[in-house]
Amino acid sequence: PVPLKLLAANVPGVKAVLSTLGPGGDTIELPPAAPDLHMHASSPCTELSPAKYNASQSDVATGLGMLEWALNLFLERGDHSWSIENVSTPTTRKVFAEYKRRFPREVDFATLDAADFGAPQTRVRLIAAPPSLIKLLQQMPSARRVSVREAFEAAGLEVAAEAFKNQTRNRDGSPCMRSVEEQSFTVCASHALTWCSRDGKTVRVMNSKESAALMNFSPTWRLPTGSRTGQRAVGNALCVAMSKAIMQAAIAIYKDEPVALYIPATLTPMPPAPLALPVHAHIMSPTPPLSVRADQEAVLKSIETLIKGYRHEPLSGIAP
């Protein structure tokens, strides 16, 4: 897969492993659970997203199976620090509410907007993690809202119009639009946002480089070639601002120190988070924390594992 190859090219020294999980799948060796190891999972959310109205019960069950598989893995391993990201829907919230009831000391979750952490877009996602990590994320002060214009200036890009629109319409039939002086709509994998005039007239569709700027990716981050492939990779990524916040919280817990003051990601140079195609679930931790150098004591170990394919079977080690 192209994003997997580009991940290794974008982050020198990272180890990427392509594996098939589930019954009959590959056996992968992960480092043992440790206080300085953070595990992250972003299972495919396409079948669970509210945007997919025609998802069958089988599709939804498959999506939930992947979500539960990742959570069961962390619980069975006894990981000290972990996080899961997915869409926030009544269905996904119900799943995590049940796990929280069964494992109150190990599992908590919250619906968070990446805009509160410095992303130049509205991006509401469900984040699950140990209770201490969720508490720190909820306690972080909201970042100053970053506009599309600011994000593009930081990335060295020109705005192509004074407004943009998504694929939805208002009740009167007019397109849903926003000014470049505001935050963008959520960046999606299936289709990019569209530049338009203030009266809604289409100028052109955003390219993947522009979409990447709205996800806080560095201008130097290499993207897959091809507009559809690039957009799919960017739209399915964990937003860099949220990734940074999660790791800041994880580091604070590990070091038993207050969380460092958060600075919006679009205003500071930083390496972006890994990408994933819709057919992948990935278990990962972001690249070594930005504020922690290799010679410092609190560098978290980082692993990168992209998982291709999935067949769900409950883990026997997790009792109801």
What is each PLM-predicted segment?
Residues 11, 24-38, 42-204:
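Class I S-adenosyl-L-methionine
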Residues 1-23:
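SAM cofactor-binding core of SAM-dependent methyltransferases
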Residues 9, 72, 248, 252:
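Short, well-ordered alpha-helices that flank and scaffold nucleotide-derived cofactor binding pockets
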Residues 150-320:
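C-terminal target-recognition/interaction regions appended to catalytic cores
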Residues 3, 94-96, 242:
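Residues at alpha-helix caps and immediate loop-helix transition turns in enzyme cores, especially N-
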Residues 1, 138-139, 260:
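Terminal non-domain segments
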